[in-house]
Amino acid sequence: MEHQELNELVKVRLEKLSELRKMGIEPYGGKFERTHTAKEILDNFEQLVDKTVKIAGRIMAKRGHGKASFAHIQDMSGKIQIYARQNELGIDAYKLFEKLDIGDIIGVTGHVFKTQKGEITVWLSSFEILAKSLRPLPEKWHGLTDVELRYRQRYVDLIVNPEVRETFILRSRIVKTIREFLDQKGFLEVETPMMHPIAGGAAARPFITHHNALDMKLYLRIAPELYLKRLLVGGFEKVYEINRNFRNEGISTKHNPEFTMLELYQAYADYHDMMDITEELITHVAEKVLGTLEITYQGTPINLHRPWKRIPMLKAIEEATGVDFAGVKDPVQAYAKAKELGVPVEEGMGWGEIITAVFEEKVEPTLINPTFVIDYPVEVSPLAKRQKENPDLTYRFELFIYGREMANAFSELNDPIDQKERFLKQLEARAKGNEEAHMMDEDYITALEYGMPPAGGLGIGIDRLVMLLTDQASIRDVILFPLMRPRD
């Protein structure tokens, strides 16, 4: 719709608003006592036929035939037809009904019947205006197809695209089901700080803010991990948090700077237990919310039936490339092998960083059905417990579905001396320009020095899980109000 045309339509509606007020009608009404939703009437027609009902909603379509008019109104449950006739409403009220616009929100009283065409309808005896719409909705045959506009004006998107509403209803059910599952397993939901004096718990660039009263720099949290593990030190044995993380990074179909994570920690467990609970949790959610473990994502069938494949990173790389990096521990030789494979690596990278880059380039995109990739290098896992039998590797896994990371977990490092040494190595990386390397967190080291029980920890990206289970191509399609660059 052209800007000038839109302005003209808004002008006409403002004039109607003025007319209503001159008539003594308040176009922004108060409470309206509904007896039913649209869906309740449609589902219970036999019990409600000829009964009086009161419903409210937004006018989505309207057509008139002289002294009678039909309209469709929409509430959160769906749409239902209403029928207005001059004989029942009276001349003045019917004229007012005729002047209603698509987008107006009204409350109606009437009896339930079925038209000659068989459509369940409410025959109006009265109505009232609850909110006058001053802007026209997108024309129904076009809908709201401008993707960027859909994100900027999500409120309009939700009005005109019922499938978008359904996605966010499913999101709510998914999160609720996760909470119920963990609560039944004996986990305690907790809340940890959103503003941290030290950014930690993940390799990411933080958002920085300033606390005026304390005159100190603070970081929006990139992960709650180090606070949740402090709770293990304090004696809590099974904790979880579902909340927002913030990372000052690029935006893509898989990344939004503000996103929702589930993190859980279980004392006296390890990464095998975390694999088990991840499988059980995601399959439980899929069965409860979707009713199936065989889903289709972006046209690709995915089988969620257990057990899921588990494969060491080095073995996955060897199967994909033919190169056994377990026998190429020298970083210079590993660098040369990676270059031969066409993997973008940089001189000076360590062995663990190189094989991780090879994995991400050559293996990750091929992992369509759920796959746990286990035993990550210690260089890229500064918070994971080192393997006794192979100290270059850790007891860590990531879960991949459709070539995307869905979860990250490990047997937690609880040795304060080892943890401090790894933090120091991360500081060296920061000094060389790696803004995502961990900062030193002395208080966390102090906590570990009091003794933290061995534990398994798990993080699942809620947004990516919702994308998978609702078949949405972009993370923005599962976040109600994704971050957008302001318009000029």
Swiss-Prot record:
It is found in: Cytoplasm. One of its GO terms (molecular function) is tRNA binding. Binds 3 Mg(2+) ions per subunit. Its EC number is 6.1.1.6. Keywords: Aminoacyl-tRNA synthetase, ATP-binding, Cytoplasm, Ligase, Magnesium, Metal-binding, Nucleotide-binding, Protein biosynthesis. It comes from the Bacteria. Its cofactor is Mg(2+). InterPro entries: Aa-tRNA-synt_II (IPR004364), aa-tRNA-synth_II (IPR006195), aa-tRNA-synth_II/BPL/LPL (IPR045864), Lys-tRNA-ligase_II (IPR002313), Lys-tRNA-ligase_II_bac/euk (IPR034762), Lys-tRNA-ligase_II_N (IPR044136), Lys-tRNA-synth_II_C (IPR018149), NA-bd_OB-fold (IPR012340). One of its GO terms (cellular component) is cytosol. Mg(2+) 1 binds at residues 398, 405. It is an enzyme of class 6 (ligase). GO terms for biological process: lysyl-tRNA aminoacylation. The keyword Nucleotide-binding applies. It catalyses: tRNA(Lys) + L-lysine + ATP = L-lysyl-tRNA(Lys) + AMP + diphosphate. Signal peptide: none annotated. Mg(2+) 2 binds at residue 405. NCBIfam families: lysS_bact (TIGR00499), PRK00484.1 (NF001756). Homodimer. Belongs to the class-II aminoacyl-tRNA synthetase family. HAMAP family: Lys_tRNA_synth_class2. This is Lysine--tRNA ligase. It comes from Carboxydothermus hydrogenoformans (strain ATCC BAA-161 / DSM 6008 / Z-2901).
